[in-house]
């Protein structure tokens, strides 16, 4: 139902609702659906930086006595967005809850990268429908990347009318106003901005832990790979100022955090949008080496923008870890061209050579898509051979999932699903084989582990990660949680290592 249809419906029903408040004044401001056409546009306007986030007096104690629940799907960027929304809720006076049954507001922070992720969200909306019947005052919201898609918003409006609000990735800072509109409106509040995006600083955050932290360094993507919806849902590439990033990380270090992950849809493009200074990811990492914090890592990289200066800086080590996630997607130059990745197999292998030369202990992981439209057996074999040649430690592997609105979704696909599944199975067998081979090399070695907490499988066992992002399980006192320790590896598994504590916590210098 579009805006005009809703207004007409309201007028038609006005005779039966004379005693109710007239909500039509809200519709002009709260029905702003997404447009993939607008989201694709890239202009030359300067990125707007907002630094004055604050709550007007009208929102003071707005959420007192109420509870919120956020379910997060997808990538680390979504996890960080959830931390920001939790911060806004808390500032409003809301309290968190871990149960939808106990919540006054339920938000689903969604992922649009694959069809399976969207199916999970609509499945959850189905479960929430009965909860809404039992608790009509419950506010249900859908936010994140799915909200930026026209087809998703249309489906919500048509088949999920128990949803009270829909907002996107560009206007999280407007959550207080969206909540207020949803409370008063009798229709679904839709406020999705299909724009290039701004940078909003000084937003409150409730971080998930006190050991590791996400820090956004940039937003958006301008690469427009033919299979990917992200440039449409996250806007253009726009970088935070380095002084803001460094200040945030120094503050986290002062508060005891041990590890920072720098976030961006394409972190290697950091600084390319600056007009007043030549400053890239390598320059930022070089400055962050001087910050008194144990570990700094970043994700996600694009091979096209991974330059020599960054490699040189990473080779200096220190608090810059030796793990690099470098999505290749395919080992075939022809496939990479159709994907619009803008690099060849040879370019990727040369980049890997440079990284390994500068960082001999570098651990590389990757993302791979199989079954892309018209992928041949020979092209798939090129992916298998590249995987062996690089010697990745592990990979995230996927069957291609068409995303409406992307160029690849319109491509003719002559690869049968059974062939795609067989290729994925073969690739995963190779991934598993190399993973256990790589992990077996750690047996007998002493590694540095940042202790995250109890093992998910055994509360008597502690779990943490090495600098190269290897999961290590070992028995020790829970007082070591949050500390850096030395562990001797005694057993190697496909996805983890087991070990024994060999000394007390490491002093971070």
Curated annotation (Swiss-Prot):
<dbReference type="InterPro" id="IPR002792">
    <property type="entry name" value="TRAM_dom"/>
</dbReference>
<dbReference type="InterPro" id="IPR006638">
    <property type="entry name" value="Elp3/MiaA/NifB-like_rSAM"/>
</dbReference>
<dbReference type="GO" id="GO:0046872">
    <property type="term" value="F:metal ion binding"/>
</dbReference>
<dbReference type="GO" id="GO:0005829">
    <property type="term" value="C:cytosol"/>
</dbReference>
<feature type="domain" description="Radical SAM core">
    <location>
        <begin position="207"/>
        <end position="437"/>
    </location>
</feature>
<feature type="binding site">
    <location>
        <position position="228"/>
    </location>
    <ligand>
        <name>[4Fe-4S] cluster 2</name>
    </ligand>
</feature>
<feature type="binding site">
    <location>
        <position position="111"/>
    </location>
    <ligand>
        <name>[4Fe-4S] cluster 1</name>
    </ligand>
</feature>
<feature type="binding site">
    <location>
        <position position="145"/>
    </location>
    <ligand>
        <name>[4Fe-4S] cluster 1</name>
    </ligand>
</feature>
<dbReference type="GO" id="GO:0035597">
    <property type="term" value="F:N6-isopentenyladenosine methylthiotransferase activity"/>
</dbReference>
<comment type="similarity">
    <text>Belongs to the methylthiotransferase family. MiaB subfamily.</text>
</comment>
<feature type="compositionally biased region" description="Basic and acidic residues">
    <location>
        <begin position="16"/>
        <end position="25"/>
    </location>
</feature>
<feature type="binding site">
    <location>
        <position position="221"/>
    </location>
    <ligand>
        <name>[4Fe-4S] cluster 2</name>
    </ligand>
</feature>
<keyword id="KW-0411">Iron-sulfur</keyword>
<dbReference type="InterPro" id="IPR038135">
    <property type="entry name" value="Methylthiotransferase_N_sf"/>
</dbReference>
<keyword id="KW-0408">Iron</keyword>
<dbReference type="GO" id="GO:0051539">
    <property type="term" value="F:4 iron, 4 sulfur cluster binding"/>
</dbReference>
<keyword id="KW-0819">tRNA processing</keyword>
<feature type="binding site">
    <location>
        <position position="225"/>
    </location>
    <ligand>
        <name>[4Fe-4S] cluster 2</name>
    </ligand>
</feature>
<dbReference type="InterPro" id="IPR006463">
    <property type="entry name" value="MiaB_methiolase"/>
</dbReference>
<dbReference type="InterPro" id="IPR005839">
    <property type="entry name" value="Methylthiotransferase"/>
</dbReference>
<feature type="domain" description="MTTase N-terminal">
    <location>
        <begin position="66"/>
        <end position="184"/>
    </location>
</feature>
<feature type="binding site">
    <location>
        <position position="75"/>
    </location>
    <ligand>
        <name>[4Fe-4S] cluster 1</name>
    </ligand>
</feature>
<keyword id="KW-0004">4Fe-4S</keyword>
<feature type="domain" description="TRAM">
    <location>
        <begin position="440"/>
        <end position="503"/>
    </location>
</feature>
<dbReference type="Pfam" id="PF00919">
    <property type="entry name" value="UPF0004"/>
</dbReference>
<feature type="compositionally biased region" description="Polar residues">
    <location>
        <begin position="1"/>
        <end position="15"/>
    </location>
</feature>
<keyword id="KW-0479">Metal-binding</keyword>
<keyword id="KW-0808">Transferase</keyword>
<keyword id="KW-0963">Cytoplasm</keyword>
<dbReference type="InterPro" id="IPR023404">
    <property type="entry name" value="rSAM_horseshoe"/>
</dbReference>
<dbReference type="Pfam" id="PF04055">
    <property type="entry name" value="Radical_SAM"/>
</dbReference>
<comment type="subunit">
    <text>Monomer.</text>
</comment>
<dbReference type="InterPro" id="IPR007197">
    <property type="entry name" value="rSAM"/>
</dbReference>
<comment type="function">
    <text>Catalyzes the methylthiolation of N6-(dimethylallyl)adenosine (i(6)A), leading to the formation of 2-methylthio-N6-(dimethylallyl)adenosine (ms(2)i(6)A) at position 37 in tRNAs that read codons beginning with uridine.</text>
</comment>
<dbReference type="InterPro" id="IPR020612">
    <property type="entry name" value="Methylthiotransferase_CS"/>
</dbReference>
<feature type="region of interest" description="Disordered">
    <location>
        <begin position="1"/>
        <end position="25"/>
    </location>
</feature>
<protein>
    <recommendedName>
        <fullName>tRNA-2-methylthio-N(6)-dimethylallyladenosine synthase</fullName>
        <ecNumber>2.8.4.3</ecNumber>
    </recommendedName>
</protein>
<dbReference type="Pfam" id="PF01938">
    <property type="entry name" value="TRAM"/>
</dbReference>
<dbReference type="InterPro" id="IPR013848">
    <property type="entry name" value="Methylthiotransferase_N"/>
</dbReference>
<keyword id="KW-0949">S-adenosyl-L-methionine</keyword>
């Amino acid at each position: 139902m579009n805006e005009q249809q809703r207004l007409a419906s309201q007028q038609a029903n006005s005779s039966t609702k004379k005693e109710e408040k007239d909500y039509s004044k809200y519709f002009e401001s709260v029905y702003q659906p997404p447009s993939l056409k607008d989201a694709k546009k890239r202009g030359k306007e300067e990125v707007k930086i907002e630094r004055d986030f604050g709550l007007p007096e009208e929102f003071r104690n707005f959420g007192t006595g109420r509870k919120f629940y956020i379910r997060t799907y997808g990538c680390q960027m979504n996890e960080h967005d959830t931390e920001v929304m939790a911060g806004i809720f808390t500032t409003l006076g809301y309290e968190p809850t871990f149960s939808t049954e106990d919540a006054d507001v339920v938000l689903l922070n969604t992922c649009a990268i694959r069809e399976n992720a969207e199916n999970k969200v609509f499945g959850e909306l189905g479960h929430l429908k009965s909860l809404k019947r039992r608790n009509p005052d419950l506010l249900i919201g859908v936010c994140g990347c799915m909200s930026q898609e026209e087809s998703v918003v249309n489906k919500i409006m048509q088949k999920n009318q128990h949803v009270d609000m829909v907002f996107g990735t560009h206007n999280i800072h407007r959550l207080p106003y969206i909540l207020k509109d949803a409370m008063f409106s009798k229709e679904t509040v839709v406020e999705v901005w299909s724009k290039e995006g701004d940078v909003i600083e000084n937003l409150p955050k409730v971080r998930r832990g006190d050991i590791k932290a996400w820090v956004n360094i940039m937003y958006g993507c301008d690469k427009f790979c033919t299979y990917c919806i992200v440039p449409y849902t996250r806007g253009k590439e726009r970088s935070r100022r380095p002084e803001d990033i460094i200040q945030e990380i120094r503050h986290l270090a002062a508060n005891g955090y041990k590890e920072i992950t720098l976030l961006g849809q394409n972190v290697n493009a950091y600084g390319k949008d600056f007009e007043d200074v030549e400053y890239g990811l390598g320059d930022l990492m070089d400055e962050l080496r001087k910050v008194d914090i144990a570990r700094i890592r970043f994700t996600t990289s694009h091979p096209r923008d991974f330059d020599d200066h960054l490699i040189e800086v990473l080779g200096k080590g220190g608090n810059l870890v030796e793990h690099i996630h470098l999505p290749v997607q395919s080992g075939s130059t022809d496939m990479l061209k159709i994907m619009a990745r803008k690099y060849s197999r040879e370019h990727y292998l040369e980049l890997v050579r440079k990284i390994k030369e500068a960082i001999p202990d570098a651990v590389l992981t990757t993302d791979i898509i199989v079954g892309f439209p018209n992928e041949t057996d020979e092209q798939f074999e090129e992916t298998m051979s590249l995987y062996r040649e690089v010697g990745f430690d592990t990979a995230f592997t996927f069957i291609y999932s068409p995303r409406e609105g992307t160029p690849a979704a319109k491509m003719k696909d002559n690869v049968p699903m059974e062939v795609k599944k067989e290729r994925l199975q073969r690739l995963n067998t190779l991934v598993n084989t190399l993973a256990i081979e790589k992990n077996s090399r750690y047996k007998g070695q002493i590694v540095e582990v940042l202790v995250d907490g109890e093992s998910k499988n055994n509360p008597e066992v502690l779990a943490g990660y090495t600098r190269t992002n290897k999961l290590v399980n070992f028995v020790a006192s829970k007082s070591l949680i949050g500390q850096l320790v030395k562990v001797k590896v005694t057993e190697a598994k496909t996805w983890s290592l087991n070990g024994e504590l060999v000394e007390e916590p490491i002093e971070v210098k």
